[in-house]
């Protein structure tokens, strides 16, 4: 009996030591609901004799990944001694309505990184993950970089869900509230829709990306700066090669306890990063395609100033209400119309891991097209594990 107890104690000790050296965590989010989306726009005929092209369609049904994208992932660390750790994160996005993989069918499309970290010098990662702007502005956006059309990425394309493949990223620890990050991608999108022409053997045959930023977080104050740049591949069309999309971002929030105020500004030139893109893709009678800018779009001469004002407030101990206004003033888009987005959201916590949500968003001059409108509303449930 004593030998059995001794053996059990030794095994428990070994298990504890192993656990202290290596840790692997399974985590995830399931977000599903019911929603309605209506898109209405008209394109004038190219000539006086041409009829206008009208588009007015709506859909009602299941929605998923609204508050946060549905996902599952593995996060691990190994203690290497002297405060140094090996780290990895594999995160797979999926559609909780039908079970399909997200992020163009990638197995770990949300994140696939391995690296080293230390409390003294920071963290170095290799692989696919979000850019610095997405990391730093998510906590400033009243919608937490979620809720589809309502989030900050609708008007400030580099600030939400922009992911780069083949990236080396370094982030410092937090020094008195300050943190700096920088990353470089050798090939930003290996699953480019035009992979034959845009992904090649030579380094310059691939779209490359730079992302960097600085933030300050101290108590109720949160301030962030960011910069992103795309370098065209040699195989792209001439107009695209001449373009070097850039995005500059500045934003901040302050929590007054009864209400939290958020402000943000972005300047985008020569293209659109479009981490989420627009939900409409239509081929016009002329053969031209309409649908706003997609992911990592190159457009020489394009310029846009974007603004966001947001508020959020707790109601009781379990509810939050939040809203924002975004405006994008573009140039050289073909339409050049100012886009305004008005959004309102609400969450109710059923527990620490499960909550209900509702939101509504209305966009005028949607995708920079005159009188184009997009309305999105939805209710759902989110569970974290």
Curated annotation (Swiss-Prot):
It holds the Pfam family Porin_4. Its main location: membrane. Changing residue 29 to T: In strain: 10901. It is a multi-pass membrane protein. Homotrimer. It comes from the Bacteria. It is found in: Cell outer membrane. Keywords: Cell outer membrane, Ion transport, Membrane, Porin, Signal, Transmembrane, Transmembrane beta strand, Transport. This is Outer membrane porin protein BP0840.
């Amino acid at each position: 009996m004593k030998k059995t107890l001794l053996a059990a104690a030794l095994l428990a000790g070994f298990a504890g030591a192993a656990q202290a050296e290596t840790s692997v965590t399974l985590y995830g989010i399931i977000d599903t609901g019911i929603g309605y989306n209506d898109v209405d726009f008209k394109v004038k005929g190219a000539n006086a004799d041409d009829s206008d092209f009208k588009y007015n369609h709506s859909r009602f049904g299941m929605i998923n990944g609204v508050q946060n994208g549905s996902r599952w992932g593995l996060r691990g660390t190994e203690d290497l001694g002297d405060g140094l750790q090996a780290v990895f994160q594999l995160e797979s996005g999926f559609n909780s309505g039908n079970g399909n993989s997200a992020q163009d069918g990638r197995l770990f499309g949300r994140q696939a990184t391995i690296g080293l970290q230390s409390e003294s010098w920071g963290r170095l990662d290799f692989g696919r993950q979000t850019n610095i702007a997405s990391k730093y502005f998510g906590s400033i956006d009243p919608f937490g970089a979620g809720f589809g059309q309502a989030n900050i990425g609708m008007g400030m394309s580099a600030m939400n869900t922009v992911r780069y493949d083949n990236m080396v990223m370094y982030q410092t620890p937090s020094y008195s509230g300050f943190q700096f990050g920088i990353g470089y991608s050798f090939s930003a999108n290996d699953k480019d829709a035009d992979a034959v022409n845009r992904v090649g053997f030579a380094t310059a045959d691939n779209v490359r990306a730079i992302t960097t930023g600085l933030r300050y977080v101290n108590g109720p104050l949160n301030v962030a700066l960011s910069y992103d740049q795309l370098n065209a591949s040699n195989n792209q069309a001439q107009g695209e090669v001449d373009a070097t999309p850039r995005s500059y971002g500045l934003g901040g929030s302050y929590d007054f306890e009864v209400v939290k105020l958020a402000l943000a500004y972005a300047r985008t030139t020569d293209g659109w990063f479009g981490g989420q893109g627009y939900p409409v893709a239509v081929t016009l009678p002329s053969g031209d395609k309409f649908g706003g800018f997609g992911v990592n779009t190159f457009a020489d001469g394009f310029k846009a100033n974007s603004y966001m004002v947001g508020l959020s407030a707790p109601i009781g101990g379990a509810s939050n209400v939040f809203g924002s206004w975004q405006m994008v003033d573009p140039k050289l888009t073909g339409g050049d119309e100012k886009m305004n987005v008005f959004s309102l959201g609400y969450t109710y916590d059923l527990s620490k891991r499960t909550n209900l949500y509702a939101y509504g968003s209305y966009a005028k001059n949607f995708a920079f097209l005159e009188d184009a409108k997009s309305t999105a509303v939805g209710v759902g449930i989110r569970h974290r594990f």
